[in-house]
Amino acid sequence: AQAKKHKKAKIYIDKQSKIFSSKRFIKKDELLRLISSKNVDTVIAAISGSDGLELIHHSIISGKKVLIANKEPLVMAGEFIVREAKKYGAQIIPIDSEHCSIHQSIQGKRENSISKIILTCSGGPFFNLPKSKFKNISLKQALKHPIWKMGQKITIDSSTLMNKALEIIEARYLFNIEPKKIDAIIHPEG
């Protein structure tokens, strides 16, 4: 939606999409040149997995404001990303989920003034299931999230609460806070 709104936006997608006309797409080498340009001040990093790490690092060493839309880069390389951002004067800003809300709520506060971060999770499809029945859980049951419609991997991560563990790692690096000061609580309404 943002790319359509901003007519001159350049789009790099690691897999070709039918959403936009092909003349709006650019190749990776062109993207790296564009990121380095003085005309670019902000880069949205929304490539899943490790594929986006090179682009994030290039944005950081170019001193850009990097809007991160997923947790994977910080889970894989959080310490490196934060260290490089400080070194090159880049900003790392989360634009996804609870981390975006936390970021917005702590603006203007001293970094060490955060005493605790509490992340919520729905508890997934097995919240009320007795532990004795866990051994009989099927893939179909695990893929039926009570609140969200998501892809298979994120649904399984959510069902097993692994997603929340990854978000704790993400928060640790984004907000420079020790893991013992980050809690996750179940809130069934999601």
Give residue spans per PLM region.
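Short beta->alpha connector loops at strand-helix junctions that form conserved
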Residues: 14-15, 69-71, 96
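Basic phosphate/pyrophosphate-binding loop/patch that engages nucleotide-derived ligands
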Residues: 80-94, 106-117
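A short hydrophobic/small-residue beta-strand
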Residues: 65-66
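Glycine-rich beta-alpha junction loops
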Residues: 17, 97-101, 119-126, 160, ...
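Conserved anion/nucleotide-ligand pocket segment
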Residues: 101-163
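Rossmann-fold NAD(P)-binding glycine/threonine-rich loop
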Residues: 49-62, 71-91
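N-terminal glycine-/serine-/threonine-rich beta1-alpha1-beta2 phosphate-ribose binding loop
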Residues: 1-50, 55
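Substrate-binding/catalytic subdomain of NAD(P)-dependent oxidoreductase enzymes
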Residues: 156-190
